[in-house]
Amino acid sequence: MQIKAEEISKIIEEQIQSYEQRVEMSETGTVLYVGDGIARVHGVQNAMAMELLEFPGGLMGMVLNLEEDNVGVALLGDDTQIKEGDPVKRTGKIFSVPVGDAVMGRVLNPLGQPIDGLGPLDAKEFRPVELKAPGIIARKSVHEPMPTGIKAIDAMTPIGRGQRELVIGDRQTGKTAVCIDAILAQKNTDIHCFYVAIGQKKATVALVADTLRKYGAMEYTTIISATASEPAPLQFISAYSGCTMAEFYRNNGKHALIIYDDLSKQAVAYRQMSLLLRRPPGREAYPGDVFYLHSRLLERAAKVNDSLGAGSLTALPIIETQAGDVSAYIPTNVISITDGQVYLEPNLFNAGIRPAINVGLSVSRVGGAAQIKAMKQVAGTMRLDLAQYRELAAFAQFGSDLDKATKAKLDRGARLVELLKQPQYEPMPTEEQVASMYAATRGLMDDVAVADIRKFETAMLDYLRSGKADILNDIKTKKALDQDIENRLKAAIAEFKKGYQA
């Protein structure tokens, strides 16, 4: 085989032409101090706020403090392998998480990595965790109902799509239970649900995931978990990660519901980080921007106007109070940000009234516009009836002789309280709630013993479902009680009572 000189020179020429010099530029710094999930890094002069820095071993850190000679970094993971003098590299990326249908039905950590053992995520899109909330022009007032399946809430503190309704109460009063029921109630709707567990026990998160799987709700739910053993920066950022994933649906003309369980623990994690970053402490040692911490998160829940797709993101933040003190710093902050609150009380819980909702202190500031007409018709006077009942019950304890009208009000109130009790994991469809409340508020249950009210209600709804399903369907489709439906419902209940044996 003969090699020609011109061939060799041609090959060499091609090689020279295709030769490309690659220089990888990266700005690096050095760890000055590390501990408690916080690092101080010197030398990354051009780092941006919220930028990710890469530490040895692939650990990421998020820039929070930009100071004259160093930056304060929150480490998003275990800091035991990081030591003073370690090199740190700028990534030039802002902290982002995966979004889209790939996250549905998964359990993720705040970085968007799966922790459920079901394999990697097939995410096509990533979004930054810190995004601006929609402006005034982009919004529309809340007007569509988002039923929770809980009678006391849907009747008296209704929630609309795009609303922020706070669930507040002491520990062990059923706050998480109310929110899990709200997720279960979305089973046959178009709402995608997100549950953010902040600072919870791992066993609690596992129980929530098992419950959602058992009731077939996991297929439209994503759990973002930053448990109590995770570093404070992960607990702080988890709410924003979950919000970004949920916002994807809002921005694409769909509907989402997000539960933050709970924001008290997020505030504690943020306080820890801020103190370690040497930011000045304020009231209760929280930093001055703890209000902004929660307001910028909850303002991202919104009902978007029609030109932007008419999507919505509804938020149910949870706050844990200490001994019923709703006037503490964090509870008052979040109450002032949200559009109403559901207040759960230990005394009611211990008295067997579950869900333990205090009807007097619970309000929904915008949900009234979202409540369907049928519910307004049957439950309009309910709050007043219960308020009068509580007042009269306190008065009746003195054992004075009561006139007929007062006694009737007391009897009606006792039946309403009994009717509003509901077992866990059994959300009730709106049309069944309407039928049940109609019977109670129109006096059709006045001759049923208080102890038998729930038994009577169950039997009555079974009867309506099996024999008079057309009435329930009409309530569902018309969303109002016209004279015809009311007459048929009244007749059906009267017919049922004839054959009912308590």
Curated annotation (Swiss-Prot):
Give the first-level EC class, as a single word.
translocase
Residues annotated to bind ATP: 169-176
Name any one GO molecular function: ATP binding
Where is this protein localized, as stated in its record? Cell inner membrane
Q: Does the keyword DNA damage apply?
A: no
The protein's topology relative to the membrane is: Peripheral membrane protein
Q: What is its main location?
A: membrane
| UniProt site positions, description: Required for activity | 362
Which superkingdom, per the lineage?
A: Bacteria
This protein's GO cellular component annotations are: plasma membrane; proton-transporting ATP synthase complex
Q: What is its EC number?
A: 7.1.2.2
Which Pfam families does this entry report, sorted A to Z?
Answer: ATP-synt_ab, ATP-synt_ab_C, ATP-synt_ab_N
Q: Which reaction does it catalyse?
A: ATP + H2O + 4 H(+)(in) = ADP + phosphate + 5 H(+)(out)
Gene3D superfamilies associated with the record: 2.40.30.20, ATP synthase alpha/beta chain, C-terminal domain, P-loop containing nucleotide triphosphate hydrolases
Q: Which family does it belong to?
A: Belongs to the ATPase alpha/beta chains family.
Q: What does this protein do?
A: Produces ATP from ADP in the presence of a proton gradient across the membrane. The alpha chain is a regulatory subunit.
What assembly does the database describe for this protein? F-type ATPases have 2 components, CF(1) - the catalytic core - and CF(0) - the membrane proton channel. CF(1) has five subunits: alpha(3), beta(3), gamma(1), delta(1), epsilon(1). CF(0) has three main subunits: a(1), b(2) and c(9-12). The alpha and beta chains form an alternating ring which encloses part of the gamma chain. CF(1) is attached to CF(0) by a central stalk formed by the gamma and epsilon chains, while a peripheral stalk is formed by the delta and b chains.
| The name this protein goes by in its record | ATP synthase subunit alpha
Q: Which gene encodes it?
A: atpA
